[in-house]
């Protein structure tokens, strides 16, 4: 059975059981900074399990794209390890529970996948008698085929929050796959028993003290790895031998000029290339971009590891983008976003390949220098910390370092390397642990929301509202009141204040009541329909139950709205000028300015920036009507409305439509028509990472003031010339030409003076052991000046050894020269290195000429004295 059939059968089966089929969420988790990647099918539904959001439907089924990288070094070397994989799952949010989950799983596996009941084994949590009863008495699984396992394997929990026992379905692959032990069973890791489906029964809430409380609304979270079950149904020894991978691996083999199945080294390389290319293709499509931190570092590491395996098969030219094109061709029907973003994805991969080729060459050069130095020191082992530096700084895999080292007769301190790697992983683990799955504050606010109910936002319609203060928080705890000058968080039944979100900053304003005045410093929405106002008491004191009038500052709200609508115009203009591959990668909308990050492969030319700016201003001049509509997510997508990959939307979405010019899903505040924006001015465009550009801009009076400041600067620039703005470029050009001519005249005079000075130095030449020796300081000379001085000396002397020094702008330079007739005895590189060392520097070079730098100008005279001893010693 092909993977496509398995995927379709699974989704259709659960649809027949009343589940809604949802498309896979992005690999980049929506609104969850604690997670780098969507690593499990339940991740998109975490808010429903934690109670942070209310689901539109209670039964859902998905085939979720997942990415995990903890065991990256195992990929390609084992039958089951992957970075990217697809997870089939069915979920219940307070609807059905164990009986349905278990019986449906058994029905699907045995009747729809056709796996023999005799090959199936079950695990349950140690004391989950309810699950045992269902498996044994309802489904009919013999008791000897049901194994009870402990908390480590069969209980799901991640810190504070919902949790529960697990039950797993295993397939017996046959005794020939086992260890031969009479005790071999599902708990054995020999590989005979393969887990294909994990059923998680979410029935408890774990608090900070480790106590477990039964949940009123229980949940189901199941996961079946598509690649694993495909390997079982297709009767192949590993996931890599399924139709999911073979087409990609065969194509990669064709590009690389090798064959799969004949050589273990080749097979491992092809598996790594296929797996990693799938991962980077899907991740980049979903908005991740190669960089040196976070998700970007993972992408870069995977790409470089795949390239390294290609290099081991003698491929130095970029090729992963070709393999990625095959991934898109194979998976594009199931995941249409792959085809929609294909041009962008493939270009990013190719650019990164070319970039790494340069980095790889730098690493090779560093490794060669390192081995040469170690040889001079009589050592034949590359220290672990230096091997790690090659890996960490240059992306140089340890396997490649070992391979090159062995060719040159070196070994690598692998233990030292592993220690450095483990230290890095330890730091990463600690960093991850600092961000809890569900923090104490999250749990506190969730409980508070359950007590208080939802907060209604009315800020789209009005800027002020009278309501009641229903809670006050200070230092993470509920309090009854706040006194003058105190800060805290206020919760009201209704609010017109827009909370920070979607790149837009929060509203500012005041909360007024009988005997008190609060300044609103910030507004946030930590949970769905739950808004907090961070305030400072300016006058009086405030307590829970007080009546209050919430007043949004209209000026800052309108300025923010102008900038937010302008970002929508800018987004559309970018697509029109640069191409449809452009997508929003981030934004910041404040009352003062806007910042828009977008995906693009290269810098935007001045000409294109002008076009983009013109398109936005033309849309402003047309005074297009800004309309707000509500529709379903499916209808919005069908209508071509722009949606962001890393945002999570409910079934009902808010569409901001600007005439016929633009339509985007957005929850922010906007102007009523584009004419209100007034004027749009781009401040600049820059790179913020591989494949991501940033534009900063101003609107309205801010843009006008900026243009006026430019006019003021131009006016000051014209004053010395007494000319118009139009005449200024020519005047400046003429001035620069005159200055260049004067510079040439000055340079010529300086060379004449230097020549005279250098010739005068020849009077200080002394003779040691028949060699003419000269050491001197050339005042104000940089390295170029020292080279010119040396040319004069060289033309005037024979049988010489020379050491010159210069200090310019606090920087020390040395140059040593040896007559070529004497290079068998004296070495300029040795001499200059010895001198530079005294001045706190270093350098070297050829036997006849070498140069170096120093850090301490006060040591220059002392450094020059080494020449006499050097010549005398030879």
UniProtKB/Swiss-Prot annotation:
Alphabetized Gene3D superfamilies for the sequence: 2.40.30.130, 3.10.310.40, 3.30.54.20, 6.10.250.550, Bira Bifunctional Protein, Domain 2, Threonyl-trna Synthetase, Chain A, domain 2
Catalytic activity: tRNA(Ala) + L-alanine + ATP = L-alanyl-tRNA(Ala) + AMP + diphosphate
Top-level lineage group: Bacteria
Enzyme Commission no: 6.1.1.7
Enzyme class: ligase
tRNA processing listed as a keyword: no
Binding sites annotated in the UniProt record for Zn(2+): 564, 568, 666, 670
Disulfide bonds: none
SUPFAM superfamilies: Class II aaRS and biotin synthetases, Putative anticodon-binding domain of alanyl-tRNA synthetase (AlaRS), ThrRS/AlaRS common domain, Translation proteins
Localization per Swiss-Prot or TrEMBL: Cytoplasm
Any GO MF annotation of the entry: alanine-tRNA ligase activity
Cofactor(s) this protein requires: Zn(2+)
Residue ranges of the TM segments: none
Family (UniProt): Belongs to the class-II aminoacyl-tRNA synthetase family.
Main function: Catalyzes the attachment of alanine to tRNA(Ala) in a two-step reaction: alanine is first activated by ATP to form Ala-AMP and then transferred to the acceptor end of tRNA(Ala). Also edits incorrectly charged Ser-tRNA(Ala) and Gly-tRNA(Ala) via its editing domain.
Notes on the domains: Consists of three domains; the N-terminal catalytic domain, the editing domain and the C-terminal C-Ala domain. The editing domain removes incorrectly charged amino acids, while the C-Ala domain, along with tRNA(Ala), serves as a bridge to cooperatively bring together the editing and aminoacylation centers thus stimulating deacylation of misacylated tRNAs.
Protein name: Alanine--tRNA ligase
Organism lineage string: Bacteria, Bacillati, Bacillota, Clostridia, Thermoanaerobacterales
């Amino acid at each position: 059975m092909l993977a496509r059939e398995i995927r379709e059968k699974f989704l259709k089966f659960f649809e027949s059981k009343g589940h809604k089929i949802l498309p896979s969420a992005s690999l980049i988790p929506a609104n969850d900074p604690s997670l780098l990647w969507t690593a499990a099918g339940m991740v998109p539904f975490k808010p429903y399990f934690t109670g942070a959001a209310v689901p539109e439907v209670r039964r859902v089924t998905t085939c979720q794209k997942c990415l995990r990288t903890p065991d990256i070094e195992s990929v390609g070397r084992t039958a089951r390890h992957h970075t990217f994989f697809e997870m089939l799952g069915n979920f219940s949010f307070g609807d059905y529970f164990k009986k349905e989950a278990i019986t449906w799983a058994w029905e699907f596996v045995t009747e729809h996948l056709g796996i023999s009941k005799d090959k199936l084994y079950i695990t349950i949590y140690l004391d989950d008698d309810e699950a045992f009863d269902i498996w044994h008495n309802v489904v009919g699984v013999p008791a000897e085929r049901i194994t009870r396992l402990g908390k480590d394997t069969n209980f799901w929990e991640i810190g504070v929050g919902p949790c529960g026992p697990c039950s797993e379905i295993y397939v017996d692959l046959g005794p020939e796959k086992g260890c031969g032990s009479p005790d071999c069973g599902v708990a054995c890791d020999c590989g005979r028993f393969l887990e294909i489906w994990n059923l998680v029964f979410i029935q408890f809430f774990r608090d900070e003290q480790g106590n477990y409380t039964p949940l009123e609304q229980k949940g189901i979270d199941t996961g079946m790895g598509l690649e694993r079950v495909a390997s079982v149904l297709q009767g192949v020894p590993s996931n890599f031998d399924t139709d999911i991978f073979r087409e990609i691996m065969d194509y990669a083999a064709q590009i690389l000029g090798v064959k799969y199945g004949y050589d273990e080294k080749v097979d491992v390389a092809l598996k790594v290339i296929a797996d990693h290319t799938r991962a980077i293709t899907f991740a980049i499509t979903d908005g991740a971009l190669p960089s040196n931190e976070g998700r970007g570092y993972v992408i870069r590491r995977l790409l470089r590891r795949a390239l390294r395996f290609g290099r081991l098969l003698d491929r130095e030219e970029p090729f992963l983008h070709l393999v990625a094109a095959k991934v898109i061709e194979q998976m594009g029907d199931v995941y249409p976003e792959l085809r929609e973003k294909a041009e962008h994805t493939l270009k990013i991969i190719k650019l990164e390949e070319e970039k790494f080729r340069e980095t790889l060459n730098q690493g090779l050069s560093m490794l060669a220098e390192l081995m040469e130095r170690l040889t001079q020191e009589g050592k034949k082992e590359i220290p672990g910390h230096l091997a790690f530096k090659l890996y960490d700084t240059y992306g140089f895999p340890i396997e490649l370092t070992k391979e090159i080292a062995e060719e040159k007769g070196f070994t690598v301190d692998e233990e030292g390397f592993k220690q450095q790697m483990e230290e890095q992983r330890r730091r990463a683990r600690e960093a991850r642990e600092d961000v809890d799955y569900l923090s104490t504050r999250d749990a506190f606010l969730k409980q508070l929301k359950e007590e208080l109910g939802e907060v209604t936002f009315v800020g789209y319609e009005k800027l002020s509202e009278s309501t009641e203060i229903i809670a006050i928080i200070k230092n993470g705890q509920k309090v009854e009141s706040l006194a003058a000058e105190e800060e805290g968080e206020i919760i009201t039944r209704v609010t017109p204040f827009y909370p920070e979100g979607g790149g837009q900053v929060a509203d500012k304003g005041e909360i007024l009541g009988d005997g008190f005045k609060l300044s609103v410093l910030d507004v946030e929405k930590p949970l769905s329909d739950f808004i907090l106002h961070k305030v400072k008491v300016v006058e009086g004191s405030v307590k829970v139950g007080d009546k209050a009038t919430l007043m949004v500052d209209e000026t800052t709200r309108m300025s923010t709205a102008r900038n937010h609508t302008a970002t929508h115009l800018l987004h559309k203009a970018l697509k029109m000028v640069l191409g449809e591959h452009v997508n929003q990668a981030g934004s910041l909308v404040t009352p003062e300015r806007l910042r828009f990050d977008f995906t693009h492969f290269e810098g935007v030319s001045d000409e294109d920036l002008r076009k983009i700016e013109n398109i936005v201003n033309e849309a402003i001049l047309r005074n297009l009507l800004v309309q707000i509509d509500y529709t379903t997510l499916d209808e919005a997508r069908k209508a071509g409305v722009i949606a962001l990959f890393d945002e999570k939307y409910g079934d009902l979405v808010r569409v901001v439509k600007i005439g016929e010019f633009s339509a985007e899903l957005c929850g922010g505040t906007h102007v009523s028509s584009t004419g209100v924006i007034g004027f749009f001015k781009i401040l600049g465009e820059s790179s913020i990472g591989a494949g991501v550009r940033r534009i900063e801009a101003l609107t309205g009076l801010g843009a006008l003031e900026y243009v006026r400041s430019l006019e003021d600067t131009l006016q000051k620039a014209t004053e010395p010339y007494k000319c118009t703005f139009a005449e200024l470029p020519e005047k400046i050009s003429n001035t620069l030409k005159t200055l260049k001519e004067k510079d040439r005249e000055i340079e010529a005079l300086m060379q004449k003076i230097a020549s005279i000075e250098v010739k005068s130095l020849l009077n200080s030449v002394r003779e040691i052991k028949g060699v003419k020796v000269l050491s001197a300081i050339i005042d104000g000379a940089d390295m170029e000046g020292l080279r010119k001085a040396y040319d004069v000396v060289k033309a005037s002397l024979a049988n010489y050894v020379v050491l010159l020094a210069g200090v310019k702008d606090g920087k020390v330079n040395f140059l040593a020269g040896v007559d070529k007739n004497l290079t068998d005895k004296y070495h300029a590189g040795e001499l200059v290195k010895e001198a530079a060392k005294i001045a706190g520097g270093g350098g070297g070079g050829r036997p006849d000429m070498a140069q170096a730098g120093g850090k301490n100008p006060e040591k220059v005279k002392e450094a020059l004295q080494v020449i006499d001893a050097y010549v005398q010693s030879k």
